[in-house]
């Protein structure tokens, strides 16, 4: 089961994409929705609104605990901001909001991302952040004009762009592969009985 934080933003498009890839999807709005998840997507949207929703619903510490448990987490655009030092503090990064400019400055780029086979990833940037500061355990996967826009630290992958808008499924496929591997390692007996 993969969760999609559904407080605001493009959560429906992420859920649809994950379902099309064969995943069972749960919209996450309150802490109990995090129970039993094998992966989580924190989608783009408006980071201040998402922050207020997380605070209102008491989700901050449960989200931190989920990430600390090793569950794969994938954040896009505002999701990158939500996971940085200043917000949930899950990643050792500092982000700059709207780093590429306002919506009128939206753009697309092709990015080579390690671990993603095939042609470059088509990245759609809309009021996108970039990473200003990375801790030493953070791996930079892609950059635009020298600014990191895709980074990973352990089980958490964040990107500054919107794969769901471009119809780019490979990053979601990566999350599902990681979730499947985690499920296999953490619940081998349960999986063995299902066969």
Task: Put a short name on every predicted segment.
Residues 25-26, 73, 156:
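Hydrophobic anchor at the start of a short beta-strand
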Residues 11, 47-49, 80-82, 132, ...:
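Glycine-rich nucleotide phosphate-binding loop and flanking beta-alpha elements
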Residues 7, 78, 161:
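Cofactor-binding loop segments of dinucleotide-utilizing enzymes, especially the Rossmann-like FAD-
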Residues 98-195:
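Amide-donor transfer/coupling interface in amidating biosynthetic enzymes
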Residues 42, 75, 159:
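Redox-cofactor binding/interface segments in oxidoreductases and associated redox assembly factors
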Residues 1-56, 65, 169-173, 177-195:
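N-terminal beta1-alpha1 cap of cysteine-dependent amidohydrolase-like domains
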Residues 46-112:
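Cysteine-nucleophile active-site neighborhood
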Residues 15-18, 33-36, 83, 133-136, ...:
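Short loop/helix-cap segments at secondary-structure boundaries that form the rim of catalytic
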């Amino acid at each position: 089961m993969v969760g999609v934080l559904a407080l605001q933003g493009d959560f429906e498009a992420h859920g649809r994409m994950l379902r099309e890839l064969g995943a069972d999807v749960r919209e996450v709005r309150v802490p109990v929705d995090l129970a039993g998840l094998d992966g989580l997507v924190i989608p783009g949207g408006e980071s201040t609104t998402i922050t207020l929703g997380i605070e209102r619903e008491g989700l901050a510490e449960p989200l931190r605990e989920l990430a600390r448990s090793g569950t794969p987490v994938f954040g896009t655009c505002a999701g990158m901001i939500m996971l940085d030092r200043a917000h949930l503090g899950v990643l050792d990064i500092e982000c700059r909001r709207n780093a590429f400019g306002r919506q009128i400055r939206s753009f697309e780029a092709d990015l080579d991302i390690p671990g993603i086979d095939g042609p470059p990833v088509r990245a759609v940037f809309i009021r996108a952040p970039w990473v200003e500061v990375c801790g030493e355990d953070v791996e930079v996967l892609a950059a635009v004009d020298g600014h990191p826009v895709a980074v990973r630290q352990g089980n958490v992958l964040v990107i500054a762009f919107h794969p769901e808008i471009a119809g780019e499924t490979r990053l979601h496929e990566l999350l599902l592969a990681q979730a499947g591997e985690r499920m296999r390692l953490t619940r081998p007996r349960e999986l063995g009985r299902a066969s």
